[in-house]
From Swiss-Prot:
Pfam families: APH. Belongs to the pseudomonas-type ThrB family. The gene is thrB. This is Homoserine kinase. One of its GO terms (biological process) is threonine biosynthetic process. It comes from Rhodopseudomonas palustris (strain BisA53).
Length: 326
């Protein structure tokens, strides 16, 4: 979450007249995250999140995201639900951006996930993948391997000034992944951005998954690989095998990874690291002046990419290929 687009109080008040969510008491921007503009609204009826969709989110994709949240919730996945306006619509326009109001989920995201929370997010991800099996809409992943070349072109000029040799690393890895990317693994609905700041907990109990603007149809194990990157490294950049084992075992309890998925996981983890390295690099080069946003460090994912390049098999993530559950 972040704030790229400023919203005047009068404009917000007029926008909210179309919704039956009570009288606006206060609102504030949410600086965390990197993609869309978000505000926390406090009204006489409770708390809500207002999201203005920016850059990478196309208006025509919103029905997919919003319908998916309703679908997942109907199957027991805890996630936000959009508020309809008085005309029965869930998407409006505010400050020239598509805008949606969703209900507020209780909980906080873990700044430093513990082992129990890693296991919990593994279980929740498997549950989401299973719940999405009969979701009727389809959205291809615009940020999968073929889309990374366009990101590379945008980011290449800023690579070596950030770290000598980074441009060559990116190009070589792109070339390798483009040729080696698996084509016959199980696919379905994936979150594609399930970082700790998109998962809420109350204590160690997971209370909800949020932020679905990157959700799409792609390789299910790629979603697992994204989480390995996001949840299983420490602040000193070391890989935490205990957390990885807990996460993978948690996932496997709900949806056991097939042998081919296990074999492909190191490659998928490289791809996930490269994807976020590229988007972070692009974002760091294109922060709007005055935006209330903290660009995230691209080099964090360069380090993760190099780690995954050294991985030989899923055993290096702390589990045996004969069975993920200990």
């Amino acid at each position: 979450m972040a704030v790229y687009t400023d919203v005047a109080a009068d404009d917000l008040a007029e926008f909210l007249l179309a919704y039956d969510i009570g009288e606006l008491l206060s609102y504030k921007g949410i600086a965390e995250g990197v993609e869309n503009t978000n505000f926390l609204l406090h009204t006489s009826r409770g708390s809500f999140i207002l999201t203005l969709y920016e850059k990478r989110v196309a208006a025509e994709d919103l029905p997919y995201f919003l319908s998916l949240m309703a679908h997942l919730a109907s199957r027991g996945v805890s996630c936000p639900q959009p508020e309809k306006n008085r005309d029965g619509e869930i998407c409006g326009t505010l400050s020239g951006r598509p805008a949606v109001i969703i209900n507020f989920l209780e909980g906080v995201w873990p700044r430093r996930p513990n082992v129990a929370q890693c296991a919990g997010v593994g279980e929740a991800l498997a549950k989401m993948h299973l719940a999405g099996r009969d979701f009727p809409l389809v959205r291809k992943n615009p940020l999968s391997v073929k889309g990374w070349w366009a990101l590379f072109e945008q980011a290449a000029s800023g690579a070596d000034p950030l770290q000598h040799g980074l441009r060559a690393l990116l190009h070589a890895e792109l070339d390798h992944l483009d040729h080696a990317w698996p084509k016959h693994l199980p696919e379905g609905v994936i979150h594609a951005d399930l970082f700790p700041d998109n998962v809420f907990f109350i204590g160690d109990k997971l209370s909800g998954l949020i932020d679905f603007p990157f959700a799409c149809n792609d390789i299910l194990a790629y979603d697992v690989a994204i989480c390995l990157n996001a949840w299983c490294f420490e602040p000193d950049h070391s890989f935490n095998v205990t957390k990885a084992r807990a996460f993978l075992n948690g996932y496997n309890r709900g949806r056991p990874l097939e042998a081919a998925e296990q074999d492909a996981l190191p490659l998928l983890a490289r791809g996930a690291a490269l994807r976020f390295l590229l988007t972070r690099l692009v974002d760091s080069l294109n922060v709007p002046a005055g935006a209330l946003v903290r660009p995230k460090d691209p080099l964090e994912y360069a380090r993760k990419l190099r780690f995954h390049q050294s991985v030989n098999s899923i055993r290096d993530y702390g589990v045996e290929t004969s069975g993920l559950v200990a």
